[in-house]
């Protein structure tokens, strides 16, 4: 192999040659819109997580109220069972969602 011939084929570039110049106003506006909290995937996800947290807290408070009031009638016992089942289902759903999301993130990281 002739090193002098290989050197002639290589291009030497500087950072100034690689830069594309300043971004246009349309590109900057599009970037800002994409990175904004409202309407972005991350913002929507955080909003949904906040709503799930509120519903979960509400269900726990309802169960606490039902457990604090003594009662032997079947209606109140069924209501307590329903509240407990709802909390359990929400916990399972959250656990499965988080597990799937972390699995998807791991897959994404492995492919890059």
Curated annotation (Swiss-Prot):
InterPro entries: T3SS_YscI/HrpB. Coiled coil: none annotated. GO terms for biological process: protein secretion by the type III secretion system. Changing residue 108 to K: Complete loss of needle assembly. Disruption phenotype: Deletion mutants display a reduced cytotoxicity toward macrophages. It comes from the Bacteria. Changing residue 84 to A: Complete loss of needle assembly. Homomultimer (through its C-terminal region). Belongs to the YscI/HrpB family. NCBIfam families: yscI_hrpB_dom (TIGR02497). This is Type III inner-rod protein PscI.
């Amino acid at each position: 192999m002739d090193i002098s011939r290989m050197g002639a084929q290589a291009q030497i570039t500087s950072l100034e040659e690689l830069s594309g110049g300043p971004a246009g106003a349309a590109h900057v506006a599009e970037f800002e819109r994409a990175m904004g909290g409202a309407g972005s995937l991350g913002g929507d996800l955080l909003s949904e997580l906040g709503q799930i947290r509120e519903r979960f807290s509400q269900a726990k408070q309802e169960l606490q109220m039902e457990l604090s009031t003594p009662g032997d009638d079947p209606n109140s016992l069924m209501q307590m069972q329903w509240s407990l089942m709802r909390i359990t289902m929400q916990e399972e759903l959250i656990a499965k969602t988080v597990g799937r999301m972390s699995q998807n993130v791991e897959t994404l990281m492995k492919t890059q």
